[in-house]
């Protein structure tokens, strides 16, 4: 088998592109800012392919199940895990921010804050309504509309119904099943083509960020940022690490396995940008297609651990900075509201801030104008949010697969311990035959 040289690996190319992007943004800020279309273009290409991949994966996963009760069982276990772990993430964020108290002493006067930049977020947040509205929003007005607008939960809902219907058809549904499975392979082939542009996208996104906000903005409100990054690391390596150990895998080896996806997320600040490739890698790791197809798409709305940590820390920080006292009842109210609002957040850049604005609107105790304090650094915290979200959903898929006895533990051990030939693993991932060894 051929062994790739270090510079041929996607993770090296993306890391190099990010470094160049930082340099361009710092030394040539105007040029860096002009690179924004490169990052936006890459994310748009990824989003273009997400809904058809989810549809095909979920349909083939469900239609391929022998027991239809399994669909409800997998979904139920996934939602139970999501609620438990994301609530734990909210609680950890709440605990750390109250211990470190980075906002104490800022004495910010909300009447003097520049709130012009909040208009877009508060307007979007104002559209958020009750749980009933959220539940009804999962049902698309039309199938075409759901695909056209890239509504993941709506596509997931339709895919589950279609998969159940296809399974009920029995042998008559087999030709359709095989066709959709072939289409899924073709779409993953498109993903492999798009991923070749990942370094360009990461370069453009990072050059724009540094060019527009400057390295100096990385140090603004640094205590909050440091606290947030520390909390995310604690959550990944302690909480998810413990969960991983209980399920038979090492979190460090798991992170090493998905390092390319993590670097793509680091460059684009969107955990959604790595979704298609993450699904393929989890199947390659030994998780069943049916579990991957149900858990990953659902997790991108119900299991955003990084966003959960951010929401509690940001809310309490604003309260501290504006000298808004919070008693135990008010703190628990914030936690309860966030348990609901955090479930509607999507894995795209900026969604966390919109969710935060919606939460503040529901909790009049904390001044909405206080969001202006963190608007400038929100972009620099989005990387940690997205990275934590990605790792959290990856771990969740392995956990649910194990609960369902749908995890090939031997395969997982071989892949994580790098006992398989690297070229063979890459070939499996790309759904291609391994290249022959050169003479």
UniProtKB/Swiss-Prot annotation:
InterPro entries: C4_dicarb_transport, Na-dicarboxylate_symporter, Na-dicarboxylate_symporter_CS, Na:dicarbo_symporter_sf. It comes from Citrifermentans bemidjiense (strain ATCC BAA-1014 / DSM 16622 / JCM 12645 / Bem) (Geobacter bemidjiensis). Keywords: Cell inner membrane, Cell membrane, Membrane, Symport, Transmembrane, Transmembrane helix, Transport. Its main location: membrane. SUPFAM superfamilies: Proton glutamate symport protein. The gene is dctA. One of its GO terms (molecular function) is fumarate transmembrane transporter activity. Belongs to the dicarboxylate/amino acid:cation symporter (DAACS) (TC 2.A.23) family. This is C4-dicarboxylate transport protein. The chain crosses the membrane at residues 9-29, 45-65, 80-100, 150-170, 186-206, 221-241, 291-311, 334-354, 357-377. It is a multi-pass membrane protein. It is found in: Cell inner membrane. Gene3D superfamilies: Sodium:dicarboxylate symporter (1.10.3860.10).
């Amino acid at each position: 088998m051929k062994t790739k040289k270090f510079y041929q690996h996607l993770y090296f190319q993306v890391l190099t592109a990010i470094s160049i992007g930082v340099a361009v943004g710092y030394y040539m800020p105007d040029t860096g800012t002009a690179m924004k279309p490169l990052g936006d273009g890459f994310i748009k290409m990824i989003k273009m392919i997400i809904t058809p991949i989810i549809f095909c994966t979920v349909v083939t996963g469900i239609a391929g199940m022998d027991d239809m009760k399994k669909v409800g069982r997998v979904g139920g276990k996934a939602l139970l895990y999501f609620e438990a772990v994301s609530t734990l993430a909210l609680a950890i964020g709440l605990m750390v921010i109250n211990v470190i108290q980075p906002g104490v002493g800022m004495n910010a006067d909300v009447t003097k804050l520049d709130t012009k930049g909040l208009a877009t977020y508060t307007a979007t947040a104002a559209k958020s309504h009750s749980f009933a509205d959220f539940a009804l929003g999962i049902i698309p007005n039309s199938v075409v509309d759901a695909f056209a607008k890239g509504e993941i939960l709506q596509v997931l809902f339709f895919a589950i119904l279609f998969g159940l219907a296809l399974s009920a058809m029995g042998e008559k549904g087999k030709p359709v099943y095989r066709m959709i499975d072939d289409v899924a392979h073709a779409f993953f082939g498109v993903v492999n083509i798009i991923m070749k542009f990942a370094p360009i996208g990461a370069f453009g996104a990072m050059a724009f960020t540094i060019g527009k906000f400057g390295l100096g903005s990385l140090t603004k409100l640094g205590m909050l940022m440091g606290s947030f990054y520390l909390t995310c690391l604690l959550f990944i390596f302690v909480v998810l690490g413990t969960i991983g150990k209980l399920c038979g895998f090492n979190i460090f080896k798991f992170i090493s396995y998905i390092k390319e996806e993590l670097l793509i997320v680091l460059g684009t600040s969107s955990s959604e940008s790595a979704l298609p490739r993450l699904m393929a890698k989890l199947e390659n790791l030994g998780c069943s297609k049916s579990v991957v197809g149900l858990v990953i798409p659902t997790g991108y709305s119900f299991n955003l651990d990084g966003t959960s940590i951010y929401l509690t820390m940001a809310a309490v920080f604003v309260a501290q900075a504006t000298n808004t006292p919070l008693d135990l009842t008010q703190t628990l109210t914030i936690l309860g509201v966030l348990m609901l609002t955090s479930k509607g957040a999507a894995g795209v850049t900026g969604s966390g801030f919109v969710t935060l604005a919606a939460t503040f609107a529901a909790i009049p105790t904390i001044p909405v104008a206080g969001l202006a304090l963190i608007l400038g650094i929100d972009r620099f915290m989005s990387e940690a949010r997205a990275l934590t979200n990605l790792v959290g959903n990856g771990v969740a898929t392995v956990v649910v697969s194990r609960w369902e006895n749908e995890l090939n533990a031997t395969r997982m051990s071989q892949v994580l311990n790098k006992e398989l030939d690297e070229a063979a693993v890459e070939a499996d991932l790309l759904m291609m035959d391994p290249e022959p060894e050169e003479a």
